Amino acid sequence: MWVMVVTLAPIEPKVRPNTTWQHESAPVDITAARWVTIVWDDPVNLMAYVTYVFQKLFGYSEPHATKLMLQVHNEGKAVVSMGSRESMEVDVSKLHAAGLWATMQQDR
């Protein structure tokens, strides 16, 4: 969704009759806010498998994938990717297909 923001400002500081106005507008994409994908701890998947999925789906190194997996295991969740809403929807779908619990939310 695009929203047009229009700002009207007089060219001269004082408003007089026959004043010309300069129109400034810039499109603002309100859906361009950053989104994150969150993987949640579950009682089913082994830690080695979760690490493997992070490496294969996101191309993370083994140490980084292991760090994220341990965060999921110890804290109950971890942010594994961030970007546009559409790309996070794709990531969540891939994680679900791999059997992991994942959600997305707008980053604050």
From Swiss-Prot:
One biological process term in Gene Ontology: protein catabolic process
Listed InterPro entries: ClpS (IPR022935), ClpS_core (IPR003769), Ribosomal_bL12_C/ClpS-like (IPR014719)
Taxonomic superkingdom: Bacteria
Gene3D superfamilies: 3.30.1390.10
Pfam (any one): ClpS
Quaternary structure (record): Binds to the N-terminal domain of the chaperone ClpA.
Entry's family note: Belongs to the ClpS family.
Function: Involved in the modulation of the specificity of the ClpAP-mediated ATP-dependent protein degradation.
Protein name: ATP-dependent Clp protease adapter protein ClpS
Taxonomic path: Bacteria, Bacillati, Actinomycetota, Actinomycetes, Mycobacteriales
